[in-house]
Regions:
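Extracellular jelly-roll beta-sandwich "head" domains, especially the C-terminal globular C1q domain
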Residues: 1-128
Length: 128
């Protein structure tokens, strides 16, 4: 993501849309919806990082076809510094399966940070 996200713009299960795209081979990632659609069957590896700043916190979920597959927590809730959390999730996908990252059920404070100091990210690749 190229900009900070104010916490007051989040809602439970709101998809994170990563607008800064370095590589999108096959165009499987949709930069409008924030969702990755598997172009074929196989084992895929996904990595995500989320940063909270200045007394903020947020749980985030890696979701496959509406089912939570991984959860992270970036928690700077009791200090005015950064807190970064990341996940690496290996998933067996069928062609057409959809994976995305969304806000979890716990969040508060001022904002999630994504700027020149730290960047929220979502990446992945097909293993087999």
């Amino acid at each position: 993501m190229s900009n900070n996200i104010p916490i007051n713009t989040l809602s439970k299960h709101k998809a994170f849309v990563y607008d800064r795209i370095e590589t999108n081979a096959g165009n499987a990632y949709n930069s409008t919806t924030g969702k990755f659609t598997a172009p074929g069957d196989g084992m895929y590896v996904f990595h995500t990082s989320t940063a909270a700043y200045d007394n903020s916190y947020c749980t985030f979920e890696v979701v496959k076809n509406g089912e939570i597959k991984d959860i992270g927590l970036a928690d700077a809730g009791n200090h005015s510094d950064r807190a970064l959390s990341s996940t690496m999730t290996i998933l067996s996908l069928k062609k057409g399966d959809v994976v995305h990252v969304r806000a979890g059920i716990e969040y508060g404070g001022r904002y999630l940070e994504s700027n020149q100091y730290v960047r929220m990210s979502f990446s992945g690749f097909k293993m087999t």
